Amino acid sequence: MLAIVLAVWFLFFNKKNSAVQEEKAKPIVVSNHSDAFNQSLAPVMATYYAMTTGFVNWDTTAVGKAAQQLKTALDSVKITEIQKDTAIYESALGPLDNIKTELAGLMGETTIEKKREDFNMVSQNLYDFLRTIRFDESKLYFQECPMAFDDEKPGNWLSKEVESNNPYLGTKHPKYGSTMLSCGEPKDTLNFMAVDTIKK
């Protein structure tokens, strides 16, 4: 009887110990940037996505609101947090300033067509900025629609999903309706998420 009890205890202990070891070996994501910097970028991405959704839905009110919030978020980016790497810091300043300039232009336009032209430039410069700083909070897709402008010129945007949710043709296009909502595909993928394979 004692032998059976010892055998059961041994099996239970080994199983529990294996589970602990498996948990310790589970990969975790480690950012190369400070928490302050990452936290200051979170509202930038959130408001950019909200603006993208506004364009998808042909909702200029939502676009305008998100653009104003994005402007506020951009002004609050703690860019000096990456100043220790001079090359990255100096290279990031140009795209960051360009985003602000293009966003101001977008907010000043009266038609959604013109706003989309500025949105395209905002997206291009945001992509350049995130690629320069090696944004590592999430995986991003730089999407491209080949017929965003007049059915012949491309337009780009950033997305967390690989599937296209097209902000240029959207759900209420005068010619296509919502049939071209999925038009587009990733032109590039930003994935700088670092993985530490040993959890301490």
Q: What label would you give each PLM region?
A:
Residues M1-K200:
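Intrinsically disordered, low-complexity terminal tails/loops enriched in metal-binding residues
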